[in-house]
Amino acid sequence: MNEFPQASSLQPRARNVVSLCEVRKVYGVGETAVRAVDGVNLSVPAGELVLILGPSGSGKTTLLSLIGGLLRPTSGVVQVAGNDLGQLSSAALANFRLRQIGFVFQFFQLFSSLTASENVEMPLRLAGCAAREAQQHAEFLLERFGLSQRLLYRPQNLSGGEKQRVALARALALHPPVIIADEPTGSLDSRNGEEVIRLLRQLVDDEQRTVLVASHDRRITQVATRVLRCEDGRLTPDSCE
């Protein structure tokens, strides 16, 4: 495999964009209770790519869901971009997620009836952008990710790597300061996985985005500024970092 540029050249900013204090997520009660996330403390400034490694069921996906406001913690404080997510109403939280957090999942959903460009335009239109402005920005993002010849293609006519790049472009449409990626290379072949890893690194290197990735893919350690391991809902530095 070709080596990626090393992450040591990155210069994170001091201000924390993501901050967790004694965060817990418990399912069930009593003796059957499951601590999916158990007392996690974490601070992430702008310009970091944090990789969270761990086996299935370790709590890493639940942790990302808490940071992304997809779940509410049982206890503790989750702050993103200076906002305590626990203090936001459901409507305010949904609006916050739309504008402040970009999500990239292993099993992403693109709308089969829309073109690649229209899929990327969707969050822009939801945020109130004019149709022409949304189209121009979507085309800019797709061209940036090497998809200038695929603007009018529908998902069923794209390769797996191309679809993942469309999903990443859509996640970036509203310039969110935080990107959350759950197994972003999990369904891709080696070459396309490497391309997505390079794009994630580029977001940090060029734009000082804060990127949090949960994955089994150790190739991402080459571009991460920090590598953590999640086991039994707790975070520790990875021993192979």
Predicted regions and their residues:
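ABC-family P-loop ATPase nucleotide-binding domain
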Residues: 1-26, 236-241
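ABC family nucleotide-binding domain
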Residues: 15-223, 227-230
